[in-house]
């Protein structure tokens, strides 16, 4: 009896599973500063294995294999699209705060220039690493095999959620009703980013939307 051949998508999902295990162990046993998580740990755990896999297993060009656009004109256009979506996210957050607390305001106090700069850099770094793994690598391959934007985006969003389970349930700042809100928001953000990436054939907008969302969340906890 012949062994069933492992498809390229199954191989990619196997790599994702290994990454999830390594990341879960890291988040459980290593309590290092956030800057180390975002600028060192995630690039090594999330991105490096993907790059090695694309080069050594798929034997493809890295940027095109991740839907990363090198065109500056397209980047500028996609930046403004992302900024618009980010503004909608901010206005939605302000509206939810007003409806709940009857006040207009989202942030306890606005950070100084250095603090804000670090928040922005961290948000961009997070957006790059998480979107490369979840959208550029996993979703792209799911979509290429199924040709169904909705089912592949939904499945990739579930995987994206599992990637956040270690931090969602380990954070002292997120609990109770807020935990549920973050879980739902993660899934919705992932669905939106996935459909945008498939429609535009570019990872730039998802990265920037993810970054804008992270900035709003970070400012909310100050």
Residues covered by each model-derived region:
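Short, Lys/Arg-rich, polar N-terminal cytosolic tail immediately upstream
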Residues: 1-6, 64
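Residue-level signature of transmembrane alpha-helical entry/exit and packing/kink sites
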Residues: 8-16, 38-43, 74, 78, ...
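Juxtamembrane/disordered regions of integral membrane proteins
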Residues: 55-58, 63, 102-103, 166, ...
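Juxtamembrane helix-loop-helix connectors linking adjacent transmembrane helices
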Residues: 31-37, 62-127, 177-178
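Transmembrane helix-loop-helix hairpins at the membrane interface
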Residues: 115-222
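Aromatic-anchored segments of alpha-helical transmembrane domains
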Residues: 18-28, 87-96, 157-166, 211-220
């Amino acid at each position: 009896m012949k062994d069933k051949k492992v498809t390229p998508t199954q191989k990619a999902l196997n790599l994702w599973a290994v990454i999830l295990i390594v990341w879960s162990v890291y988040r459980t046993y290593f309590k290092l500063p956030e800057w180390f998580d975002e600028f060192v740990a995630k690039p090594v755990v999330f991105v490096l294995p993907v790059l090695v896999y694309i080069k050594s297993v798929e034997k493809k060009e890295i940027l095109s294999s991740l839907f990363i656009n090198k065109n500056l004109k397209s980047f500028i256009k996609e930046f403004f699209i992302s900024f618009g979506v980010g503004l909608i996210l901010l206005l939605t957050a302000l509206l939810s705060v007003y409806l709940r607390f009857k006040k207009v305001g989202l942030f306890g106090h606005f950070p100084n220039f250095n603090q804000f700069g670090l928040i922005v850099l961290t948000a961009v770094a997070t957006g790059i690493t998480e979107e490369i793994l979840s959208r550029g690598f996993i979703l792209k391959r799911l979509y290429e095999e199924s040709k169904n934007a909705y089912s592949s985006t939904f499945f990739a969003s579930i995987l994206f959620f599992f990637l956040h389970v270690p931090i969602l349930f380990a954070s002292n700042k997120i609990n109770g009703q807020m935990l549920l809100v973050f879980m739902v928001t993660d899934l919705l953000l992932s669905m939106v980013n996935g459909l945008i990436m498939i429609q535009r054939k570019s990872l730039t907008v998802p990265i920037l939307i993810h970054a804008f969302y992270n900035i709003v969340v970070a400012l909310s906890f100050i």
